[in-house]
Amino acid sequence: MFDPKLKEALGRVQKPGRYTGGEPGSVYKDKEKVDVRFAFCFPDTYEVGMSFLGEKILYELLNSHENWWCERAFMPWLDMKAEMERLGLPLYTMESKDPLTAFDAVGFTLQYELSYTNILAMLDLAGIPFYSKDRDEHWPLIVAGGPCACNAEPIADFFDVVQLGEGENQLPSICAEIEKAKKEGGVSKKELLLRIAKIPGVYIPAFYDVTYCEDGRVKAITPNELGIPARITKAIIKDLNEFAPPTNFVVPMVGAIQDRASIEVLRGCVRGCRFCQAGFLYRPMRQRDASLLNKAAQDLCANTGYEELSLSSLSTSDHGQLEELLDDLNEWAPKEHVSLSLPSLRVDNFSESLIEKTTKVRKSGLTFAAEAGTQRLRNVINKNVTWDEIEKTCTIAFNAGYTAVKLYFMMGLPTETMEDIEGIAETAQKVVDLYYSLPKRGKGKGVQVTISCACFVPKPHTPFEFVPMDTEEMLRAKQKHLLESVHSRKIKVNYHDSTTSFLEGVFAKGDRRLAPVIVEAYKRGCYFDGWEECFKYDTWMQTFADMGIDPAFYCQRAIGLDEVTPWSHMDYGVTHEYLVREYNKALAAQTTQPCNRACHGCGANHLLGGPCFDYSQNLV
């Protein structure tokens, strides 16, 4: 039975299915018989959150413990948020409909910097104080994890616990400490946090003090409790085969952004693209065995009824057993009307065999990341792709019957000139011309080449963390020049808004002094900042001004190679010396080969107890 207030709210919103729960695959337990209740919160809409594979992994993992219950909560859309505030309806979980205050721990995934005000909105709707210092042991522990945890400093004051790295061992260890403390009784919040701080990869922001130089730079980040490490090393799963992919998903009532079965085939990446934060955060690369993946995929499709299976990773075509895996999948997938998709294909190892094995049921779109329009700039960013490889790949795709290709690029990259921008248009035009030069192309069919151009945002833990971000004026000028450089109606251009990218850059490299700004901006009506129709750029800029903070200080200035950064106390395996070396190679337009061909000494090897190449010897 729904609460009468909830029933009233559901009758007044556009998509009530976002908020009802009861989806196939949901886990229900007797809350009186469980020892730990964990609310997994995704700070965006239901449709976006239900596309997130990480939630599915941890949902199944935590619920595999008989005496723990993991439930889900999402950020309500504007209409539901207004109804909940009008009716005094607190934010609740999808399974039990209990408010977040009824849980032992409330966990947020940090996937995107522009979700930070949504986190405050969810805490506000739940009636939970924003700041960790204002919550004692009677409140749920507020936990964060995910890629943005690598510099959680702008929101560190809101969280009790921040997980660095991979959560499969880490999160159950946190829940185990919560369970132990509850059974003991009388354990203070500080004592519980001291225990949790001993778990590998756990960062307790309250146990660190930050001091600043007169010019605003970070001076030092130091522990303020005995036994707390000066640097926190990320948690890592050494052998992914020890954690089989989920074989059941909660199937959404309302179509998710990515509504399909998905299995993670590998983690990490060997490529070393200098702009790619994920490629550095998840080093070294580890893969699952083809036999394990095939069994998990078959069970997942059977349990959920999905007819599309995505082989997910940062670079799926680098899996050493990919051809074998596709052969195994194609033994059963066509019979079950399941199509296969590879969302992260590489231009330089795409083959006719690969395309044949992924189009036996129906064709899905092809997207390739060229990233830059000239070879010089591709060398700068270490995107080891040439025009010959792009030409070969598109030829294979067009001969196989494809008539649409999307090419991903970035603008605002280090050392970029207008010549590089023109190169984007020239590359797209060469793809169009290639299509019409092929005798095997589909007769009577035209080609569509889409340029998707993101604004480059320098991120922590990458060789480009030192570089300033382009100003909005510079990015808009480059966007205008790109549009003027495209002359074919066969080419469509999409590009990101430079103002949202600017705010993303501010939070990506920000520090704890931004927390009050985020709170004030939320109070002034800023949330869903990643949504164009909701983003209030002027409100943000006025808030920064009123609070005496210059946002450009964080993202539009060069960081010294020996400067203490807000994330200096976070160790993701790759050494500072390696990042500096790669930065200098970038300025010289020198490339670094993938690390499955040779170890370059990035430092991530110590996380596995041996050289990286020992763990990737079968990756070719």
Question: Where are the regions that the model predicts?
Answer:
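Radical SAM enzyme core and accessory elements
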Residues: 1-27, 38-40, 487-620
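Glycine-rich beta-alpha loop elements in corrinoid/cobalamin-binding modules
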Residues: 76-223, 463-511, 519-533
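Conserved SAM/AdoMet-binding glycine-rich loop
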Residues: 40-41, 45, 114, 299-406, ...
